[in-house]
Amino acid sequence: MQIGILGWFGVPNAQSAVLAMLVPPLLLWALRKEKFWLLCVTAFLGFGLLYATGTRLTYFSAVLTAAGMLVLLLWNRKPLRFCLPLLLALVLLLGLKGFSPMEQRQMRSLDSNELYREKTEAVMGSDMGYAYRKGEEIPAEVKEKLERLYTEVYGVPGPYKLPLLGDMIEKFGLEAVMEAYGYTDAPEQLYNARLKKLKCLELNWQQKDFLTKMLGFEYAEATVNGNIYDPENDFPALLYYYGYLGAGLYLLFAAYFVFSALRALFRRGPGFVTLELGAAALMFCYALGAAQFSGQTLRKPNVCVYFSLAAAMLWQQSHPVVRNRPQVDRKSVVFLKKI
């Protein structure tokens, strides 16, 4: 429980995204039932699960959902008693942040960084923390230390016998890898698995021709010495796998729903801001946010199905169906009255 309840889902990032997107419509369902006890139960279960999951995405989405739904209730002048569970959840989430599984997970990451910070200090000495500026010449002594750091510390398998930068150095060369990382010696970057995946595909991308960059390259390009470096962040992955053309079309399609909602807001005014719109907007924003900052969202069918649902809800709210009443002529009305 100290590191959250991850594990029942195939991909932890995808699990967090699904939970974040499901809580707003769950609360909307309870609010539309207009039963206070039902709202209390759904708020407890929804926010409790987000808090206990132990990722930054679920924790911050819980805070934003509680605050967002609270504002929507006040905006739509709903009974104040429905605000109480959301207000209580918001206070508890903020007050118990220091005890959350998310904080415990972050502390463990800091412990790993501290281990490599000591190794970095042993190699870099007084030059630790060197800040490279693009275009400047690196002092020979500092560059020699950086080369030792990248090869002797990060060029060998890590604590879990997994490669750090060794396979990338073998494929792209030491100088290219050092340049990709900006000649940094920071453990927060060099020991960051998420960043490593992005750097690996970035180096691959730099070697491609114009046509490949327009259409993207295949998934096999993310494999180095049998290790898969498929990026966790979805937006860079869209660019690398589908090129400028595919990524541009995807973003334009997503932007259409945002444009539709903003246009409807401009035309219909404050009355357009309803609980239904708020729940859809939260789901939509969480999907985009998870794609950029967490990942495994846009490219997983079992996750992006909820993104599609949010987009459909946004479109439905922006394009209400107007039912035309049947026209009755004046003679028919007179005839009916006589009868």
Residue ranges and their predicted role:
Residues 1-22, 233, 239-246, 296-305:
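Membrane-interface micro-motifs in multi-pass membrane enzymes
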Residues 66, 280-288, 296-335, 339:
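Transmembrane alpha-helices of multi-pass inner-membrane enzymes
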Residues 240, 260-293, 311:
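Loop-to-helix entry and N-terminal half of a specific, functionally important transmembrane alpha helix
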Residues 22-30, 247-268:
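Hydrophobic, aromatic-rich transmembrane alpha-helices
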Residues 29-40, 71-82, 263-269, 314-339:
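Membrane-interface junctions at the ends of membrane-embedded or membrane-associated helices
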Residues 154-242:
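Long extracytoplasmic/lumenal interhelical loops at the membrane interface
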Residues 76-185, 206-207:
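A membrane-periplasm/extracellular boundary helix in multi-pass inner-membrane enzymes
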